[in-house]
């Protein structure tokens, strides 16, 4: 007489960030320093169930059916943590230097491979502000060289968790453990992207 199913999911995110900035000017020397820390947590909950043999097609609640078809629930958690530092310097708005470093951890990876270090640096020269630059048809001309790295853990969440995992099923009223057919990889770590 029909099947009725219900599901419910809930998610929350928490971000906890701190920054400490210091800026100072000495004549034409400008210095800007920053250190910071950030923690992020994502947690998901999911619950579902279905029953058959409905008492009425107008009653779409689980209480309106008598035979349990399936039930299920799970929860997942994902965390990242970052420590960072950055320094910026310029002289007379003509010569520029920048450097940053970040130490980043992710629960997507095995504890032995959880942390990665990423850095970036750049230098610039504003030629159009030099006294000898007299090309009036150029408003601004700047030379810049930079290199940077960043890490990516998306698409790899929980991949290593499948190592040594078992599924639980019902075998004639008894608990049966079945080895997971999905193999995890404890060696996975951050994907590092570099850009010049």
Q: How should these model regions be labeled?
A:
Residues 1-196:
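Extracellular/periplasmic, surface-exposed regions of secreted and cell-surface proteins
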